[in-house]
Amino acid sequence: DRLRSRGLGDVYKRQAVEKALSFLPSGAVVAHGGSMTLEETGMMDALRSADIEFLDRAVCKTPEDSRKIFHDALMADYYFMSTNAMTIDGELVNIDGNGNRVAALIYGPENVIILAGMNKVAKDVAEAVDRVHLTATPMNCVRLNKQTPCAVTGVCADCLSPDCICNQVVITRRSGIQGRIKVILIGEELGY
C-alpha cells in the first residue's frame, strides 16, 4: 500500500511491456538475465520480435555459447531482468548462481530495465533476503532441477552444494549513474 500511495505499482502486464519497449531505440543491443517475470509478462516474446539486436541466451547450445553471450551481455545497450526482492524504500536484493545477472546490474550495460511484481516487495533488506531464501531460491532450484536441500524441502539450508544458486548476494542501494536502472513495478504477482 505504501508503494501504491507513492504512485508505484500501478503498471500491469501489458502496460509494463509497452513501457519497457518504449525505452528501446531501433537497432539497440539488448540482453537479459534469467527471469520467470520476463516470461510471464510476455516481455521475452516482445523482445524476440522487436527491431533490436537481441542477445537471446535461450539459443545457447554449449557452455561456450553461454559464456560468450553472458560476456557480450555486459556490453549491451539494454539489459532486462527482474529482481529477487526490493524494499519499500527501493533497495534491490538479488542472489545469483553464476553471477552474470548481478554483474550486469552492477556494471556494464548502459541501461538496466527491471520488471518486478508486487510480490517481490519487502519491508526491509532483512525481509527481502528472507524472501529470496524462502521463496525465490527454492522454487528456482526446483525449476532448474538443482540438487540442493531447498529443492527437496522448500526451505533454504544455507548449503554449499555444488548446485547452489546462492553464490552472490547483491544489495543495490542506488544507481551510481542517474537513470541507468529503471524499475517497472507491476501491480500483480509475477515470478518467484
Question: Residue spans of the language-model regions?
Answer:
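Single conserved hydrophobic/aromatic residue that forms the stacking wall/gate
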Residues: D1-L8, Y12
